[in-house]
Amino acid sequence: MDFSIKGCDWSKGEAKGFLTGKSDCIVLGIFEAQTLSGAALDIDTATKGLISRVVKAGDMDGKRGKTLFLHEVSGIGASRVLLVGLGKQDAFNQKAYTDAVTAAWRALLSTKIVQVTFTLAQLPVDERSSDWGVRAAILALRNETYRFTQMKSKPEPASHTLKRVVFSVDPVDEKAAKLAVKQAVALANGMDLTRDLGNLPGNVCTPTYLGNTAKKIAKDWGLKAEVLGLKQIQALNMGSFLSVARASVEPPQFIVLHYQGAAAKAAPVVLVGKGITFDTGGISLKPGEAMDEMKYDMCGAGSVLGTMRAVAEMGLKINVVAIVPTCENMPGGNATKPGDIVTSMKGLTIEVLNTDAEGRLILCDALTYAERFKPAAVIDVATLTGACVIALGTHNSGLFSKDDALAGELLDASREANDPAWRMPLDDEYQDQLKSNFADIANIGGRPAGAVTAACFLSRFTDSYPWAHLDIAGTAWKGGAAKGATGRPVPLLAQFLIDRAGQ
């Protein structure tokens, strides 16, 4: 799909090109109080009051998400006009904008429209500029057009015909909007990769498959990939990671992916992604109901790989290292048992009270490995705890960090990217729940504050650098009729790196 930018100040009569240029459709916003947006006012004048008449007749009440096509419109180059309800003007925020553009795309994709002129990006949204609106609109469109068909013997072809979108933006934002197009497309491509990896079944998306995916990203985008096998992992004394992997016939992999966009001496940001390609719970076996969704337990790994692809396509001037410990968590005759004690790469001994709390066991060795890069910051991403889903539901990812500056950066990025996160507590008092009578630390801390104690466990391995943890158990995938991976938190991570790179 082709996206282009055209500057236009509708209030200064600069709309001639939009009014006379050929297009299948022009998209206009209408607020609930029957208020026309700047673009709608110009189109209304050009069509001799058609828009006003339609609104006054009650055919378009402006309620959020409502759409109405006007056909064979005279006075403008577009053959159709799509009116989109924006809701109340004083409540028009990021969510309202996203709802409006999503409704617009759904209406457009249900037609045979090929080219559309899109004016909604110029709407005032929480003091955001129109380049923000462009990026959010492209991501919403790519979200609507994403389909996972790789495993279908006869995949259905795309039903829409949309091929070209022209965004009208404020002239002062034209340069930034062109950059926003590039970043949005790269980000959408990274999210699609993340979704594809999550949606693949566990018999396809194995640890080896993830390793090969990392190698392909490196080959396609000029990165450096290292994929360590069992013997190399053993040589690194990653006893905690290996305690999870040991019962599976699928060999574990330890993936390290390097992107260098800045000077070699510049400290990198390290992203660590949990890569459990299927999680049965091990000996602490999960219930059978919905266990198929445990193929999504590698979505942390998928989001890190998707972010690396997006960063490379954007060409960000920053150094980034991705680390992905990946294996299956299976029961078996040689599986780790509840009560076993294992030794981590750091040397801390861990009493494994529950083998279904395995994500932290593979991440802790990866966090120790990250020390060698002398990182500027480390962010781990994991579908870590059901407790986080209970606490936050499926809207916000859980953010844990003792570093206020780093947490602030990530929260700012989450708001800018429209990829919400909520900061959770990480007080020292919670650490007491991880005490063990027999080892340095237990891998669980009981039912109370389960998401917090999981983060506390990880914090024991992050003394030498600024660190944050994102628990995406509630946001990485959806169940029900819309079942599938979401691609989150790639937007948050990418925006954080864009901000760090100053781009």
Curated annotation (Swiss-Prot):
Question: What are this entry's molecular-function GO terms?
Answer: manganese ion binding; metalloaminopeptidase activity
Q: Name one GO biological process term.
A: proteolysis
What InterPro entries does UniProt report for this protein, alphabetically?
A: Leucine_aapep/pepB, Macro_dom-like, Peptidase_M17_C, Peptidase_M17_leu_NH2_pept, Peptidase_M17_N
Q: Would you name any one GO CC term?
A: cytoplasm
Q: Where in the cell is it found?
A: Cytoplasm
Which reaction equations make up its catalytic activity? Release of an N-terminal amino acid, Xaa-|-Yaa-, in which Xaa is preferably Leu, but may be other amino acids including Pro although not Arg or Lys, and Yaa may be Pro. Amino acid amides and methyl esters are also readily hydrolyzed, but rates on arylamides are exceedingly low; Release of an N-terminal amino acid, preferentially leucine, but not glutamic or aspartic acids
Active site at which residues? 286, 360
The cofactors named for this UniProt entry are: Mn(2+)
Enzyme class comes to hydrolase
Per the record's keyword annotation, is Amino-acid biosynthesis included, yes or no?
Answer: no
Keywords per UniProt: Aminopeptidase, Cytoplasm, Hydrolase, Manganese, Metal-binding, Protease
The answer to whether the entry has keyword Hydrolase is yes
Positions bound to Mn(2+) 2? 274, 279, 297, 358
Q: How is the cofactor bound?
A: Binds 2 manganese ions per subunit.
Protein origin, superkingdom: Bacteria
> In the Enzyme Commission scheme, what number(s) does this protein have?
3.4.11.1, 3.4.11.10
Q: Which SUPFAM superfamilies match?
A: Macro domain-like (SSF52949), Zn-dependent exopeptidases (SSF53187)
Q: Which residues are Mn(2+) 1-binding?
A: 279, 356, 358
Say what the protein does. Answer: Presumably involved in the processing and regular turnover of intracellular proteins. Catalyzes the removal of unsubstituted N-terminal amino acids from various peptides.
Assigned protein family: Belongs to the peptidase M17 family.
Which PANTHER family has this protein been placed in?
CYTOSOL AMINOPEPTIDASE (PTHR11963:SF23), LEUCINE AMINOPEPTIDASE-RELATED (PTHR11963)
Its protein name is: Probable cytosol aminopeptidase
Q: Which organism is it from?
A: Burkholderia ambifaria (strain ATCC BAA-244 / DSM 16087 / CCUG 44356 / LMG 19182 / AMMD)
Q: What is this organism's lineage?
A: Bacteria, Pseudomonadati, Pseudomonadota, Betaproteobacteria, Burkholderiales
